[in-house]
Amino acid sequence: MLNPIIIKPWIKKFKAFLLCWSLSFAVIHAQNSLTKTIAADSVNSIEINGNQIFNISVTTTKNNKILVSSTLDGEYQNKYQIALKQEGTQLFLALNYVSFEDIPDDKRNANKVIAATLKVEIPEDLMLNIKSDVGSVNVTGQFESIFIELLQGYCNVVGKASSATINTIDGNIKVATNNAVINANSKHGNSKADLLKPSENVWHLYSINGDITVVKQE
């Protein structure tokens, strides 16, 4: 007669710990992360090509540096990277394909092969321009101007700008600001705006299917 094998409780817990640790280790190393810092002395405009980037976050600081952080995940993550290029006073950021290997035709659509997020910290009072096909955008801080155009994602802005234009197709637009003239219109969605103190700052908010909400910044 075979003796039963008894697994002690502490062994079960230890194995569970090893499994969780292994999974955590795999998740950490499964991502392609990148951080870059550059001087902002000669930069007055940030141009973000957000195509194929799912989440874009921009925040202003009192520092005179630009900090760019990106995380890429997915089957072909190592074949892409966030590229920075300065032309005159403009800094361009985009997700570029950097591999010499071809991606199979059935996986050409980038959202099948990579999930990208981008976080950018910039000095105050710069111009910010963002366009994206799939991305959602969160913006916080003080800007000279803001221009955002999104095909699918939403847009949240908390801060100030001398002028702003935000266009979405399906995504909602939420703005918290003050001392501004607001022109908001959604073709198939709802628009709601708090009464703000009039000023020379003008914001144009447009959406086809998304809702637009404007509140006074506390």
Where are the model-predicted features located?
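Bacterial Sec-dependent N-terminal signal peptides
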Residues: M1-T35
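Residue-level detector of intrinsically disordered/flexible regions characterized by low predicted structural confidence
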Residues: I5-W10, F14-F17, T140, V158, ...
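Acidic (Asp/Glu) and glycine-rich low-complexity loops/linkers
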Residues: Q31-N49, I53-M127, F147, V158, ...
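Right-handed parallel beta-helix
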Residues: N129-I166
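Fold-core signature of tandem repeat domains
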Residues: C155, I173-V175, I212
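Membrane-helix boundary connector in multi-pass membrane proteins
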Residues: N190-K192
